[in-house]
A protein has these predicted regions:
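Short glycine/proline-enriched coil/turn segments at helix->beta-strand junctions
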Residues: 31, 54-57, 73-79, 159-161, ...
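Conserved beta-strand hairpin/beta-sheet module of binuclear metal-dependent hydrolase folds
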Residues: 3-52, 155-171
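C-terminal regulatory/interaction regions
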Residues: 232-247
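Metallo-beta-lactamase
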Residues: 34-36, 41-42, 133, 140-234
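Short, hydrophobic/aromatic-rich segments at coil-to-beta transitions
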Residues: 10-16, 131, 140-142
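Active-site HxH/HxHxD metal-binding segment of metal-dependent hydrolases
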Residues: 43-133, 221-235
Length: 247
């Protein structure tokens, strides 16, 4: 199982957990507690990996409700913090349909139990809101509402390391607004707010390496230039029953 994950040191106490799932998780290790941000698809034994790195009490956070970020929630016994607006949609985004689709074309680990995986829940969720602060001992995790990619997306800022975790709010490829997303105007407001924070690095879930402030500025510009509201609709090639638009 150790070969399934690739753990990268980003900064003192900050570790990025990559895998073939292409949905990174992040471990923040203070002197008193550790925090895990997102649990990926949950195809590997993430709890065992975390325990091999730290024995500190663990707090778990989700950036948003999509199954490639909460797929491993059910592997943990701890309660998990998530934006309150996203909690009602977890049953949909964590459905067997989406889990099966996420398994396709993946390098599954040895001894992978498909039946257990498809029947796994998404854990006991606790709503978190902007202004919530968690003292890990020498490192502080600050919560910011970040609606856009989903209505309940959250960003997590570590001021001592000038690092911000954004989930899927910032991507290097294209902005995707699917089921449960907030409006384009709301997303632009989120970017404006987060850009005021004094961060140097952005840890985005689908980027192997840290992103820079310019990447967030670029995403904001794309959202400003897009014309989704009057764009030409077409059938979503990824999710049945949804309509996408050419902007």
């Amino acid at each position: 199982m150790s070969n399934y994950y690739d753990v990268v040191d980003i900064a003192p106490g900050i570790k990025r957990i990559n895998s073939s799932e292409n949905a990174a998780c992040d471990l923040i290790i203070g002197t008193k507690k550790a925090a895990l941000i997102d649990t990926g698809l949950g195809l590997g034994d993430l709890p065992a990996l975390v325990k091999s790195i730290t024995s500190l009490p663990l707090i778990i956070f989700n950036t948003h409700c999509h199954c490639d970020h909460i797929g491993g929630n059910g592997q943990f016994t701890q309660s998990i913090y998530m934006g309150k607006e996203d909690i009602p949609t977890c049953s949909y985004s964590n459905s067997v349909y989406f889990r099966k689709s996420m398994m396709e074309h993946r390098d599954l680990p040895e001894n992978f139990d498909e039946e257990e995986y498809l029947g796994r829940g998404f854990g006991h969720l606790i709503p978190t809101n902007e202004g919530d602060t968690f003292d890990l001992g020498g490192l502080t995790l600050m919560v910011y509402d970040a609606p856009g990619h989903s209505s309940g997306s959250r960003a997590y800022f570590i001021p001592e390391r000038k690092i911000i975790y954004v989930g899927d709010s910032v991507l290097r490829t294209v902005l995707v607004f699917g089921y449960g997303a907030a409006s384009r105007k709301t997303y632009i407001h989120t970017m404006d707010k987060l850009l005021k924070l004094p961060f140097d690095k952005i840890l985005a879930s689908h980027s192997y390496n840290p992103l820079q402030r310019e990447d967030m500025e670029r995403c904001k510009r794309v959202a400003e230039l897009a014309d989704y509201e009057t764009g030409e609709p077409f059938e979503n090639p990824i999710r049945d029953g949804e309509t996408a638009r050419i902007c």
